[in-house]
């Protein structure tokens, strides 16, 4: 959680929090009793939180600030507890004094007031209007659209715990009007304390290609830094990136993850649709988590559950919309290519994948692959022009775990949970990069293959293919 800096913030009405920094602007709340600010459109002084959670700079903040300045509507979505409300506190530039208002749609009374006359409630002097948990009242989007189309300089920031753009009504209302961003749990490079998150190894590789990898190999970190970041990576991939977990001992972390799951079953599902049998849905969660890193077969899961295939598809959709799982699509360079067309299933947090899939025995290799995919999702969400992310697999069995590609560059990534990579590990990457070139995906772009390990050394495996430790790829540069 952040300490007070140049931010717009919320102040609990029920707590007296000491201020760490005086006279900073505050976002006022319309009615949520947890937040306090007078009902004029002036700012209050800030009070910092006392949760004990260290401040971690979020890489998404700069991009979110830019999108809010440029577009009338910005949508920020992500799973619960990823820090969406916290990042709003850090959102606006230092010295800004635009009046703002915050509506929490978790509050049923607020939802009733807004439903009675949404345009009037949203149309007043505030220049920044924040609607939190927008998936609870998507009907408000018609009023948001109307006010945004007036072109009066007003900005709307919509926060949601579901992929609202997968909901048809939301997609149709916001088409062409909204900037869309996603906030995932913390990435490894965000586990620093300071004013901003540094660049990661992957940032430099994506910008510079093989030259950046060669520089990483030639300039290893000090022994102390290596020990520090190897330890952080090990803990990060074990416990995931939910910010609330950081100050907790292991037993409390396990309890928090179990509570997170119970809250999801008892509360979040109601925002998405009706599930008649929660026990059956919970069992489906376990079975799907145990399959993290595998091709998704709805029919296999349906057989194990003893339910219809359409029921499993519905469960998967709920889990995808609420950011619990991610379906990685295969790269299809041509319509006629003989490639696997089923998606691969990944849980979006390695700790939850481990907790839910434990009884069914999810393998360490699958969990490591899941952790690498999760880091790639976080990294891609921070990019102004995010690359496409796919996997590659032919019916003959040739496979590469992840393909990051843009028109001018391709990076193929293989996850290996071992300490060392071998030259034979480079062969699939070399073959697939060659195949992509032949199929016109790479074209004139530069191409690079990475085998991500749990080891220490950055080392070449074959021309254009390198072994890179996870902590060097996703941790800070320098």
Label each region the model flagged.
Residues 1-81, 85-100, 105-107, 314-318, ...:
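A cross-kingdom feature that marks ATP-driven nucleic-acid transaction machinery
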Residues 60, 133-136, 140, 162-166, ...:
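Helical "lid/switch" subdomain of P-loop NTPase nucleotide-binding domains
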Residues 295, 300-305:
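A short alpha-helical element within helix-turn-helix/winged-helix DNA-binding domains
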Residues 311:
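Residues in the helix-turn-helix
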Residues 113-157:
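Conserved nucleotide-sensing/catalytic segment adjacent to the nucleotide-binding pocket
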Residues 155-161, 182:
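Structural recognition of the conserved hydrophobic beta-strand(s) that form the central parallel beta-sheet
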Residues 39-41, 169-289:
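Interdomain motor-coupling "hinge/lid" segment immediately C-terminal to the ATP-binding subdomain
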């Amino acid at each position: 959680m952040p300490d007070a800096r140049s931010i717009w913030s919320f102040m609990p009405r029920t707590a007296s929090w000491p201020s760490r920094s005086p006279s900073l602007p505050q976002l006022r709340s319309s009615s949520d009793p947890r937040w306090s600010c007078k009902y004029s459109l002036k700012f209050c002084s800030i009070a910092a939180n006392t949760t004990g959670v260290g401040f971690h700079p979020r890489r998404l903040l700069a991009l979110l600030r830019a999108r809010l300045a440029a577009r009338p509507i910005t949508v920020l979505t992500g799973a619960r507890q990823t820090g969406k409300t916290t990042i709003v506190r850090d959102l606006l530039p230092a010295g800004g004094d635009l009046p703002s208002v915050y509506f929490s749609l978790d509050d049923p009374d607020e939802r009733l007031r807004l439903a009675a006359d949404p345009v009037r409630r949203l149309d007043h002097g505030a220049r920044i209007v924040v609607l939190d948990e927008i998936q609870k009242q998507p009907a408000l989007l018609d009023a948001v659209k109307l006010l945004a189309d007036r072109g009066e300089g007003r900005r709307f920031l919509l926060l949601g715990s579901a992929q609202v753009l997968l909901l048809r009504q939301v997609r149709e209302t916001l088409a062409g009007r909204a900037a869309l961003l996603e906030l995932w749990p913390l990435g490894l490079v965000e586990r620093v304390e300071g004013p901003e998150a540094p660049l990661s190894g992957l940032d430099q590789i994506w910008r510079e290609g093989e030259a950046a990898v060669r520089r990483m190999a030639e300039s290893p970190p000090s022994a102390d830094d290596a020990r520090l970041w190897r330890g952080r990576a090990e803990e990060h991939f074990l416990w995931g990136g939910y910010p609330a977990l950081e100050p907790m001992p292991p037993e409390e972390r396990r309890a928090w993850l179990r509570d997170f799951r119970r809250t999801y079953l008892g509360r979040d599902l109601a925002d998405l649709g009706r599930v008649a049998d929660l026990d059956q849905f919970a069992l489906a969660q376990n079975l799907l988590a145990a399959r993290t890193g595998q091709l998704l077969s709805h029919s296999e899961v349906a057989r194990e559950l003893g339910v219809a295939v359409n029921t499993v598809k519905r469960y998967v959709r709920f889990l995808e919309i609420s950011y619990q799982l991610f379906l990685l699509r295969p790269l299809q360079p041509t319509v006629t290519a003989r490639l696997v067309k089923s998606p691969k299933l990944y849980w979006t947090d390695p700790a939850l994948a481990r907790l839910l899939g434990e009884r069914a025995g999810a393998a360490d290799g699958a969990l490591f692959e899941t952790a690498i995919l999760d880091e790639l999702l976080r990294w891609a969400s921070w990019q102004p022009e995010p690359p496409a992310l796919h996997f590659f697999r032919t019916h003959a069995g040739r496979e590469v775990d992840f393909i990051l590609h843009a028109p001018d560059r391709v990076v193929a990534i293989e996850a290996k949970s071992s300490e060392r990579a071998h030259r034979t590990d480079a062969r699939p990457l070399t073959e697939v990069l060659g195949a992509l070139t032949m199929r016109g995906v790479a074209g004139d772009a530069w191409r690079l293959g990475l085998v991500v390990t749990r080891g220490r050394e950055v080392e070449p495996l074959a021309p254009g293919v390198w072994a890179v430790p996870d902590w060097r790829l996703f941790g800070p540069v320098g």
